[in-house]
Curated annotation (Swiss-Prot):
It holds the Pfam family Pribosyltran. It is found in: Cytoplasm. It comes from Caldicellulosiruptor saccharolyticus (strain ATCC 43494 / DSM 8903 / Tp8T 6331). It is an enzyme of class 2 (transferase). It catalyses: AMP + diphosphate = 5-phospho-alpha-D-ribose 1-diphosphate + adenine. This is Adenine phosphoribosyltransferase. Catalyzes a salvage reaction resulting in the formation of AMP, that is energically less costly than de novo synthesis. Belongs to the purine/pyrimidine phosphoribosyltransferase family. NCBIfam families: apt, PRK02304.1-2, PRK02304.1-3, PRK02304.1-5. Its main location: cytoplasm. InterPro entries: Ade_phspho_trans, PRibTrfase_dom, PRTase-like, UPRTase/APRTase. One of its GO terms (molecular function) is adenine phosphoribosyltransferase activity. Keywords: Cytoplasm, Glycosyltransferase, Purine salvage, Transferase. Pathway: Purine metabolism; AMP biosynthesis via salvage pathway; AMP from adenine: step 1/1.
Amino acid sequence: MNLKEKFRHVLNFPKEGIDFIDITTVLQDKDAFKYAIDSLVNLVKDLDFDLIVGPESRGFIFGAPVAYVLNKGLVLVRKKGKLPYKTVSVEYELEYGKDILEMHIDAIQPGQKVVIIDDLLATGGTTLSNIKLVEKLGGKVVGIAYLVELTYLNGRENLKGYDVRSVVQFESSLI
């Protein structure tokens, strides 16, 4: 299956000059969704790890089924104030300001090996924040897998030293 053809491009969303890669077209196509999950499983099944970290919110969509198939635990990363128990947090920069991501303080034990699974790699900024959360709790990121990588934004460069994998790569924007 050519999964790349299944994504919808929404030009100038959420703002002018952005080529937004819409995953909903993959999710609503049962064969494409299954292929996407199977592909992510194949990307990470050779890694030695304990947990999958799924960042809010699309990381939940892809991280949960991969964790299920590989019989791994799933840790959620949420925006500030969304988790009910004590948390560890990290502040990160957005184009338009700052935000805070959180994880339960007991979600990862020291020495546990983690794979981060998310929908898309753009600049890598959000992933770096997720890495900081994992490392604050003493975990080790042994792999990062994305359904989509926008190679023209060079996010992989910001994640040097980490094992970065992706199912589909877009080499250029449609804008």
